[in-house]
Amino acid sequence: MRAFSNVSRISRVSRVSRVALAAPARTVPLMNRNAMSMMRFYSEDAKASEKAGEKAEEKAEEQNLSAEEQKLKDLQEQLDKKTKEAAELKDRLLRSVADFRNLQEVTKKDVEKAKSYALQKFAKDLLESVDNFGHALGAFKEEDLEKSKEISDLYTGVKMTRDVFEKTLKKYGIEKLDPLGERFDPNKHEATFELAQPDKEPGTVFHVQQLGYTLNERVIRPAKVGVVKED
């Protein structure tokens, strides 16, 4: 009986030992599976976090880009506005310069007209005196000049005075118009009479009754003339 009891005890110990030895073998795969599950969980979680981070970065970049684009848009609008203002200012400036130049031209012409009118009036007043000197010189006879020194000196004095007058007139652009022998020009001459002259060309001036004058090449007094009559 004692021997049987010992055998039974040994048999139980053997079973327990086998169970104990077998248990770790079953536990190891279970631990591996749990570890792998945890690793997979953490890996997926890391990927999700990484994707979330990438999306956040992309969103931030988009926001930054949108802000830069808005800033550029604002700057472009400001530039366009300033460009338009500059163009308007330039246009106004050019118009002002053009108006000023036109005013200068008008003022210059008005001054020239006023000067010309005053000079023309002055010249006309003097022309009568010059004519009188001419008439006086024409009244002297050649034989009287040769006979009398006093008459000759008087003639010389009158002529010198007339020459001074004519020189003064010429200084201001007033020229004598003596058309003797020229073709009659109604713009420069005033025909007081016509007469047939066999030895002269018809339509030409054969006698100057009164000299004409021009001011800066513009007639201020036409010459009074006698014209050869047409056949």
From Swiss-Prot:
> What does UniProt give as GO cellular component?
PAM complex, Tim23 associated import motor
- Keyword Cell membrane on this protein? no
Q: Tell me which PROSITE patterns the record gives.
A: GRPE (PS01071)
Matches recorded under Pfam families: GrpE
Query: Which SUPFAM superfamilies does this UniProt record tie to the protein?
Result: Coiled-coil domain of nucleotide exchange factor GrpE, Head domain of nucleotide exchange factor GrpE
* Subcellular location(s) per record: Mitochondrion matrix
Q: Which UniProt keywords apply?
A: Chaperone, Mitochondrion, Transit peptide
Q: Which GO terms describe its biological process?
A: protein import into mitochondrial matrix; protein refolding
One Gene Ontology MF term = protein-folding chaperone binding
**Family, per the entry?**
Belongs to the GrpE family.
Oligomeric state and interaction partners are given as: Component of the PAM complex, at least composed of mtHsp70, MGE1, TIM44, PAM16, PAM17 and PAM18.
> What name does UniProt use for this protein?
GrpE protein homolog, mitochondrial
Identify the gene encoding this protein: mge1
